[in-house]
Amino acid sequence: ELISEHALPRLMRADAGTVIRWLRSLPAAWLDRRPELHLTLAWALVARFELQLAEEAVCAAERALGAGAGPEAGGNLAILRGLLTLAAGRTGEAIELYERALERLPEGADFLRGLLFLELGTAHLIADDLPAAERFFAQSRTANERAGSTFRVLVSEWHLAEIRIAQGRLHEAADLARQSLRRAEEGGRNSPGAAMAHGVLAEIEREWNDLPAAVELAGRAWQLGKHGEIANGLLVGSFTMARVLQSLGDFPGALAALDRAEEIMNRAGQPRFVEVIHALRAGIQLDQGHSEGDAEALEAAARWAQGSGLLDGWREALAGGRFPGVHRRELTFLVVARILLARGDTGAARALLADLLALAERSGRVHSQVEVLILESLARKAQGDTAGALAALRGALTLAEPGGFVRTFLDAGPEIAGMIRQAISASGLSPDYARRLAEAFGTDAAMPEEAAVAMPAAAPSQDLPEPLTEREVEVLRLIATGLSNADAGRRLFIAPSTVKKHLENIYAKLGTRNRTQAIARARAAGLL
């Protein structure tokens, strides 16, 4: 009786681990006498992405209930069956199950209605119908507020924020995430429900090129997700940390973060998601190989590409159901396009990019359009079409300006840096956005790039036992924009090993151990 009374409130506060331990401590016969506890266990397992075990709990509930399931238990079963169907990749079938369950719900069943709206939003998001997904997530937030399920309100707001990011509405997404944080922290600063909001803010700060802030937020998302044993928080923290560390040039750290995500998805029995993680790993290895001259990393990326069959079979895979949801397919195929470009197969790369751009335009995913147009610009440049390359880059800049995108351009590498000045000056961007982009690239949109590199900024005042040299300040500023050692060396016309030596001196003078700490310490000291 005590567990039955407290399990659901615990679950609504995102404490899945405690609920699972409670229910697994009971004899199976006791759960059979209270079939609703089988359902509560299933929901707790879903929260941890332990979907195979969740299905076992659903089957146990169905056996215990027989034909005597009332409206509430029947509604729970229908939603869980839809969720497991969705996880198996049968999106259309899952939507039909959810809609039938919604029709059968009694009046006032806000808890179940909130669950259904949340799952309908997820299904439409996977189907790449962003307007429908946004509508259902908004309804989920309202119904879950009425039901008192704060955690599911936060999940709904997380999805709404992610949709805004996809649509290029980064400022609105940040406002919504901060609102979610305030709501979550009403339940205590260490509320697991805050994990996803921290992850959203980490993603946005990364895009706005505040990498130290992004590292801190992504780490917080992971810690809170781990504290509550909430898989969404762990995944958001892992994926975002991987992207931030990739931008910082910490490739081993980025790969380790992806390893954590893969462990979660393997436990969930989700091989299609794992395949996406493998693609993201290949993208990191590609960056590592180009940035550090690491032949082994390049070979690893090439092995993934060959083994996946996507270099030649991308068209069939893009149209089929091999990957879970259009957006996740796109993450994979952006890596494929980059590998095709690296191999010099620009024709195939441009054909793939044209299909990806059409998908992104159809659903209004501005962020994706920006990423595709940047790669299109690189492909056209490789073909010698300078005018076409600049036109594609200007298109990306125009789409990116309202959200203030910066990092997506920086991460495209030095080839984009060579075109950015011309593209900025010809794109009609606002002076503020043009200035922020120019500063991020270490150039001035109003002057030749060579002159911008040659003109150091005024040296800041330093209150350090041993002040940084002018060259060390230059290195620190470039590293703070997220450039790798190799890219910073190219800007300063010095070897990557020399950049590394300067960084070692900087760490010693600032009393730090890595670039993230050094950037944070330098900001606090007014050096940046």
What are these regions (language model features)?
Residues 452-510, 517-528:
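Helix-turn-helix DNA-binding segment
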Residues 282, 337, 372, 377, ...:
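Hydrophobic, well-ordered secondary-structure elements that form the walls
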Residues 4-9, 36-50, 73-90, 112-129, ...:
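Tandem amphipathic alpha-helical repeat scaffolds
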Residues 7-8, 20-28, 59-69, 99-109, ...:
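Amphipathic alpha-helical segments of tetratricopeptide repeats
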Residues 303, 307, 311-321, 419, ...:
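Intrinsically disordered or compositionally simple regulatory linkers and C-terminal tails
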Residues 237, 246, 257-271, 275-418:
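Alpha-helical solenoid repeat scaffolds used for protein-protein interaction
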Residues 1-98, 102-111, 117, 291-294, ...:
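Flexible inter-repeat linkers and adjacent short helices
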